[in-house]
Amino acid sequence: MKTLKSYYKLSGILLSSLFLTMSCTKDFTELNTNPAGVTDEEAMGDFALVASFLAQGQRAILSENVGEYQVSNNLTSDAYGGYFGAEAPFVGNANNLTYSLVPGWYSSLWVDRYIRAMNPLFRVELMTRNDEKMKDIFAFAKILKVSAMHRTSDKVGPIIYSKYNAPDESDQIHYDNQEDAYKNFFKDLDTATTILKTYKGKEVSAAMKKSDLAYTSNNYDRWLRIANTLRLRLALRVAFKDAALAKTEGEKALNPENGGLLESTADNCFIKLSTDHPLNIITTTWSDTRMHASIESFLGGYKDPRMEKLFEKATDPAVKGQYKGIRTGIDIDAKSRYDNYSKLLPLPNKMQLMVASESWFLKAEAALRGWSNAGDAKSNYENGIDRSFEMYGLSAAATAYKNNSSDKPMPYIDPKAIKAGQNDINAGSPFLSTITIAWNEADSKDRKLERIITQKWISMFPDGDEAWAEYRRSGYPILFPVVVNYSNNTIPTNPGIRRMPYPEREYNSNSAAVNEAVKMLGGPDNGGTRLWWDSTNKKL
């Protein structure tokens, strides 16, 4: 069995399925001077090797591998973020959803991001960093690396990032604390945007055309916008913890001289997959996931027309003809109990990385905070709704929706609960949001923030990583807590799980470094410890 530590050094592990003829070496010096064990001519050629590495990196940001997606996304962030519930009582119902965290599941997340994302993207950086003709590819790899690794840090905290491929004299690979990791993300985005600004208006290179799995035109402009929108996302992520850093980075993203943000649905970033979307397989082939009760409450209460674009109506006789979701962390005795609740409608074989509606909601919050070049909060908020409705072909319904000042999330009733009423969220519950849709200038800043985040959450579906991160960061949207908590008092039922632990194999092979990382956390390595940016003070 490979140790996790070997994944932090460029030994080519688990890439052989793509690169069967690629020779590898464990010599650190050689790897830094001659990455992947090939000559410059072999590496560049018709760009096939670079494109293959970049394809693997792009598809690993959210993992197109269905097994890994299920345990590292669908049974963690997709559920904790209020998008999906599981109808199966995995591991005797003592699993991630009931806060009895399964080591093999969170180990999959950790390994996947380093093998399939960080490893190939770092290789591309080494292969292109000194080649003036490949600067666009170098910048592209930087953006993808930040896209993948911020999601990793947002799940666990301190990560191996700036010290990747740099073992110490004891062969330990050390972590960045989360604050330093974020600052390094911003530095990498600085590098990428500085380069891509010089490519604006230029013909897209053959290497970029071959490597980009999202866009077929205006590639440089759109990836520059992705980088700026990503910077704004990360700036707001730290805003409750380090307001000065957030403002500096956020205003850099908002400065129009830096290339702009995602604006139109044509800018939406979806990565083409080599197989069916993992959520389709998990939903239909495996029958393991259904609509979450929280998103049922919001979409149903708002009479949101996007509901019918996302989910099927339930076929269970108890709720037939309704849209019906499952709460996370409930008593489940058999898969058949909830198997006929609402399924996700089939998704195309492409993975949503970032959409323009998110950009407008980010700008709305930035305006609420008074950041330069953020514009007007109300206009940005309504533009976010417009872009989301447009994405689903519902533009004609957007105006009435934006003007709806009365509808609120609806109570949740589960007629199939093992114990009647156990899973219900009734009117007046503190876990039932009362936020309406229409912008109200008279509301407090905190109320406005709840409105912005709630609509952003709906618009980002099905990106559970961002849903869960924003919920922990801001406290919004107001989601239903677990009913059953098997964490042995290590994870609070309210406000819920805060992170995933480090894998056991990391303790076995990189013990000094991971123990140092746990000290950086400021708490035990369990699901109840808050991340650096997860401030207890969430008031604007």
Give the role of each language-model region.
Residues 401-540:
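C-terminal functional modules
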Residues 86-144, 148-397, 441-450, 455:
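Structured, solvent-exposed acidic/aromatic patches
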Residues 1, 24-27, 57, 146, ...:
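Terminal processing/anchoring signals of secreted or surface-associated proteins
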Residues 33-35, 340-341, 428-433:
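Short acidic (Asp/Glu) and glycine-rich catalytic loops that position anionic groups and cofactors
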Residues 20, 66-67, 394:
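Intrinsically disordered or highly flexible coil/loop and linker segments, enriched in small
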Residues 69-73, 310-313, 396-397, 464-473:
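Short coil/turn segments at secondary-structure boundaries
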Residues 1-22:
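Sec-dependent bacterial lipoprotein signal peptides
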Residues 24-82, 104, 112, 127, ...:
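Membrane-proximal, proline-rich intrinsically disordered regions
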